[in-house]
């Protein structure tokens, strides 16, 4: 069987299809908004569907902003949006065995915040860099959610330009940290993307969870890298460099 949601740009008929190996439709779901990445069919026959909100706070290809849960019969059971001045969901999600959902989000940082941690340039007229974070959200009721765990790339930076800053170090000796000066921070005129100027830095795409190891893996398109982080940590441990099963935060 195959589950898919066609990406259509000009339509009010957004659907998810479950088909068999002969292409016959087993079930379908109708949605008011277009898909952000890919849907997930759960063991209990519910569907988790990431969708593109009407007005994303950080706009670029693959942007989403909303999550919905449907019954097998298409009844909307839950819907929640992550599209505000701090966070913007984009690309993939990962439903967890406990019913929670891992969500990739942009985390907006100003040029001043970037310079304060050693960033040397901002390549876009927004004067922003869109960092990345992983949020574990727990659905609450019909339209709410709680963040029960989180990991922020901003807590794991290194730079070798300004020795007066606490994150100064030899980059090659710290593969667990991210060089704040690696890669461009978005695009501006005349090379803007269809959504306009942006602060996209790493551009995370896919996320997956390994239940046996309690680890999260995700990929960066812009930097051609795959990362693995420890999910056994507390949120406080995840912001540092110790604790958890790996002992590295």
For each feature predicted by the language model, list its residue ranges.
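Histidine-/acidic-rich catalytic cores in large beta-rich domains
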Residues: 1-249
